[in-house]
Amino acid sequence: MRRILVVAAAFSVLGFTGAASAQPRQGVDVNVSIGPNLQKNAHDYGSRELTDISNDLKEAVQSAVAHSRAAPPVRVDLVIEDAVPNRPTFDQLGRTVGLSFRSVGLGGARVSGMATYADGSQRPIREQFYETDLTQERGATTWYDADRAFDRVAYDLGRGKFPAEFSGPGPTGGGHFGYPFNNQ
């Protein structure tokens, strides 16, 4: 019995030591801005929505880079060039009578930017994800596919991978829920 207690104590000490050495990195400066094309949709989506998705991208990148095994950048500047919601935003629901939150569409996002390293070198970042199959949208939240694009950016940065060109299909949905849509 005594031997079991000694072994258990040793494992607990080793476990705590391993956890202490796996502390996340600090100090990565992540800046996210909204591109001019997406700013044009601010009146339709709502400015709160754009603030929320930029915060989502920032948090995803900070988390991935902090836990990265690759040499992390010291600064990441990102631009959300385009984002299309899967479901109506709060502003769209408030503006259109009869519009349901159950309405669903094809969403996604396009992100570009630059990662700067401690030695001054810079690497461009270009990533996009747009869903093309409506059957994949069951249970999707408002910005589900945009979040998938943000997760791809974060994953690539965490692994030190930088797609030089946009890949995959472009936007297939407009993100404009309700009829008629007034573009003014």
Predicted regions and their residues:
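Repetitive helical segments and hydrophobic/amphipathic motifs
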Residues: 11-12
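Amphipathic, soluble alpha/beta structural segments
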Residues: 82, 140-184
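A structural "domain/chain start" motif
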Residues: 2, 8, 17-56, 86, ...
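Short secondary-structure boundary motifs at beta->alpha junctions and helix caps
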Residues: 38-49, 121-160
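Short structured motifs
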Residues: 47, 62, 95-99
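Surface-exposed short loop/turn segments
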Residues: 71-73, 77-119, 133-137
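N-terminal, post-signal-peptide region of Sec/Tat-exported proteins
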Residues: 49-82
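Short loop/turn segments at connectors of secondary-structure elements within structured domains
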Residues: 26, 70-72, 123
